[in-house]
């Protein structure tokens, strides 16, 4: 039994930590809008990833990434929202007052 592979190339942004760009083929950015390319900066290659493999992405669903690449030619993963340190502190110290 053979499983089809859907490899994608993953790049990180030098301008925004935690922002990643997924494209169908390595070094092919034709489908990425120019404005996004400018905002993203010069893509830094991270790895090739099999979207049909057993491994799952940490912050995005493999199926969503694959669908976006097939329909628009790329997938942009935004950085996670910043942690609210005050809220975390208050929750941890709730009963200590």
Curated annotation (Swiss-Prot):
Signal peptide: none annotated. Pfam families: YcgL. InterPro entries: YcgL-like_sf, YcgL_dom. Disulfide bonds: none annotated. Residues 6-90 form the YcgL domain. PANTHER family: PROTEIN YCGL. This is YcgL domain-containing protein APL_0712. The lineage of its organism: Bacteria, Pseudomonadati, Pseudomonadota, Gammaproteobacteria, Pasteurellales.
